[in-house]
Amino acid sequence: MKNTDVKYLEPHILSFLNNENAMNTLHDIRRGIERELIRTTPESRISNLPHPEELGSALTHPYITTDFAEAQLELVTPAMTERKTTFDSLASLHHFVATHLPDNEIMWGASMPPELPSDDEIKIAAYGTSNAGLHKVRYREGLANRYGKRMQLISGIHYNFSLPDSFWEILHSHIGSELSLNDFISERYFHLIRNVLRNGWIIPYLFGASPAVDKSYLINQEHALNLLDDETYYLPWATSLRLSNMGYSSNEQSFYPTSFNSKQEYLADLCHALTTPSERYTHLNGDQQLNASVLQLENELYGSVRPKIVSDQLRPLYAMCHHGIQYIELRSLDNNPLLPLGISEDQSYFLDAFLTYNALAPSPELTDSERELIARRQELVATEGRKEGLLLPTQQGDRELKELGLTLLSSMMPVASWLDNVFATEGHKQGIEREKVKFIDSNLTPSAQILTIMKDEKLSYKHVTQRLSEMHFKQHKDVEINKEEMAGLSRLVGESLAKQQRIETLQDMSFDEFIQKKNDLQCDCEIEEVVA
């Protein structure tokens, strides 16, 4: 019986792959990487020191900032067309940070946190005294009060990906779409997102690297994890505890599902969550969150993939309404502590093939029942994905994970060959072949490799991660980086600090007024109305 959960490319799309003009546009695919890391001490504990001034302003630096906690770094590369340049940029950021941290700190290379103190001792990120900075702090206070600080200290990698407008323009013509080009691009990104949701279980299976956690993460939590040693809890077949229900998730948001069937439906659902008070949060006062809505801000929406747009003038909801989607953010990648950068160029080849395939394969609208299947699949793969003979729910009934995975990789091959032809490489096909073997032998997955090290060497999660992090930290410090790039990063430190100071000096309203203005959200945005 043919597995129809995996979508094969349709004939008119296969003919599109032979379009020379379309092929030429692919050199303008852009990819950017964001990596979250925690600054830790030699004892594998979260640092209690402030964000180093030598790294610049966390509020205004474009590439080196903080996530939830003061000790939680976020390194952001620009979106670039050359894969090597993207990874060189990520390596440069790691080198710059490694050479500017206090002597007793390193960067924790895993997704699940190091040893954590009590919540009271975990410092929320600080951004200065400007309204914009205080707004970021208040938002994080809300996250802490809603979900707890521990969950917010789970770190990951975000892979930002866009196909060029020229590519979409040719596909628009090839299909004969009656939508405007801007609307067509947005709808195709939602098309891509729906398929990423369907097929996204493959990401934690292949790249999940969080099968275990330090016991301090679980204080005052109910859980079903097994004790590996005095300091470590784990699940024997887990791939990514980070992506499981005990990881980065929100029960409240599950009652307000967001549609990805069209831009209009997505924006309507998002605005509903941003303007609907939640009974769970109304007991918190104004100092404890930005507002009592299901979502304080758009960024609070959890999920493995997001539509994105960059705008300095408009909040994301309005920017997306007026200008459409610019790129997608794949959020389901764990930090792989076995890799110096947490992600590799080889992995990037696979991700590009995966995302391009999802942009081109058939993508019917998601029903409520299919969304439930997707959620069950992700939880099964996250918690027991390496279990021999594991069955995953599909619309045609249960199927073996191995069968589903190999079928999906096979269906991606025409796109991988196409990309290899364009870029004169074998990287995309090799990427798929490299991942195929993990379905044949689950011991080759990073989650299995990490558990093997822990068991064979009788070391805790904390000690294995500390050792790997120290090794990679030394590599980051020792690596040779382009002097011009280092000078540019040094210059950005001063510029970002000066920019923060200017912002703090030029306050034009009180913080209460600022909050009120930010919370004033209307859900009647007209799609046709274009604003600056």
Predicted regions and their residues:
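A glycine-rich phosphate-binding loop feature that marks nucleotide/adenosyl-phosphate handling sites
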Residues: 113-115, 213-217, 371-381, 428-441
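Short, flexible loop/turn elements at secondary-structure junctions
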Residues: 39-41, 77-79, 111-113, 161-167, ...
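Extended, compositionally biased alpha-helical segments that mediate assembly or anchoring
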Residues: 425-532
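Histidine-centered divalent-metal-coordination microenvironment in nucleic-acid enzymes
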Residues: 36, 151-164, 327-334
